[in-house]
Amino acid sequence: MRSKFKDEHPFEKRKAEAERIRQKYADRIPVICEKVEKSDIATIDKKKYLVPADLTVGQFVYVIRKRIKLSPEKAIFIFVDEVLPPTAALMSSIYEEHKDDDGFLYITYSGENTFGN
């Protein structure tokens, strides 16, 4: 999936911003969170997050649920490189494995358990 954030901001600018964030907040992870295009779930109001390194994927999902005001009975799935990460995994380990060349971790979310084909 194409990232709108990547389309809107040139690589050098993104890279410089991620480096600045990592220097200033060494214990935080710069995350870009965007909705899977064809999903009927609510669009998030904020794409950029600075999450604690020791936050779990499950805790991050909770943050996203609150931001989009998702009711408890509705499902939400997040993807990193088109794969569902383990709920108990730390954001720091997901970041180390999947961070983009620009230094950001790109996460997409959907109301469906499939990666929008």
Curated annotation (Swiss-Prot):
GO process terms (BP): autophagy; protein transport
PTM per Swiss-Prot/TrEMBL: The C-terminal Asn-117 residue is removed by ATG4 to expose Gly-116 at the C-terminus. The c-terminal Gly is then amidated with phosphatidylethanolamine by an activating system similar to that for ubiquitin.
Keywords from the UniProt entry: Autophagy, Cytoplasmic vesicle, Lipoprotein, Membrane, Protein transport, Transport, Ubl conjugation pathway, Vacuole
GO CC terms of this entry: autophagosome membrane; cytoplasmic vesicle
Transport among keywords: yes
Gene3D superfamilies the record matches: Phosphatidylinositol 3-kinase Catalytic Subunit, Chain A, domain 1
Name of one Pfam family that matches: ATG8
Recorded topology in the membrane: Lipid-anchor
Site (Cleavage): 116-117
UniProt xrefs under SUPFAM superfamilies: Ubiquitin-like (SSF54236)
InterPro entries assigned: Atg8-like (IPR004241), Ubiquitin-like_domsf (IPR029071)
Location(s), subcellular: Cytoplasmic vesicle, Autophagosome membrane; Vacuole membrane
Residue numbers covered by the propeptide annotation in the UniProt entry: 117
Lipid attachment points (Phosphatidylethanolamine amidated glycine): 116
Primary localisation category: membrane
Similarity section: Belongs to the ATG8 family.
Known function: Ubiquitin-like modifier involved in autophagosome formation. With ATG4, mediates the delivery of the autophagosomes to the vacuole via the microtubule cytoskeleton. Required for selective autophagic degradation of the nucleus (nucleophagy) as well as for mitophagy which contributes to regulate mitochondrial quantity and quality by eliminating the mitochondria to a basal level to fulfill cellular energy requirements and preventing excess ROS production. Participates also in membrane fusion events that take place in the early secretory pathway.
PANTHER family: MICROTUBULE-ASSOCIATED PROTEINS 1A/1B LIGHT CHAIN 3-RELATED
Protein name, as recorded: Autophagy-related protein 8
Gene this chain is encoded by: ATG8
